[in-house]
């Protein structure tokens, strides 16, 4: 998931992501771990960009999460931060 936020919400949003959102996503049981990163380059004057990579063992588990859990967890972000962020998903596969 790639997320771009307005700088004014950075502290509150980071706290929410680390203490609430990411733990809630992991607590669904569909993902094994998460890696939370900040984009350093290219620098964007309009906002701050972050990424969370959630790892799961099967595509089926990912699809179940999207269908059963994602809408309500995503809504919590909109309820709290409104239009001060944008987020989009990318589905990737690890190549060993």
Label for each model-derived stretch:
Residues 28, 68-69:
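Structured segments of extracytoplasmic/periplasmic soluble domains
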Residues 7-9, 58-60, 95:
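Residues that cap or initiate secondary-structure elements
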Residues 35-48, 75-96:
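Glycine-rich beta-strand-turn "strand-cap" elements at beta-sheet edges
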Residues 1-4, 36-68:
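Short, well-ordered beta-strand segments in beta-rich or mixed alpha/beta enzyme
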Residues 19-23, 53-56, 71-75, 84:
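Short, low-complexity, polar/charged sequence segments that are solvent-exposed and flexible
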Residues 5, 29, 61, 76-83:
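A generic structural signal for ordered secondary structure
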Residues 9-36, 74-75:
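Short amphipathic alpha-helical segments
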């Amino acid at each position: 998931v790639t997320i771009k936020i307005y700088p004014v919400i950075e502290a509150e949003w980071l706290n929410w992501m680390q203490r609430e959102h990411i733990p809630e996503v992991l607590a669904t049981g569909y993902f094994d771990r998460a890696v939370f990163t900040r984009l350093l380059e290219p620098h964007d004057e309009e906002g701050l960009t972050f990424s969370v990579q959630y790892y799961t063992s099967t595509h089926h588990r990912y699809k179940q999460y999207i269908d059963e859990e994602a809408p309500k967890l995503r809504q919590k972000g909109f309820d709290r931060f409104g239009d001060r962020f944008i987020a989009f998903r990318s589905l990737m596969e690890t190549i060993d």
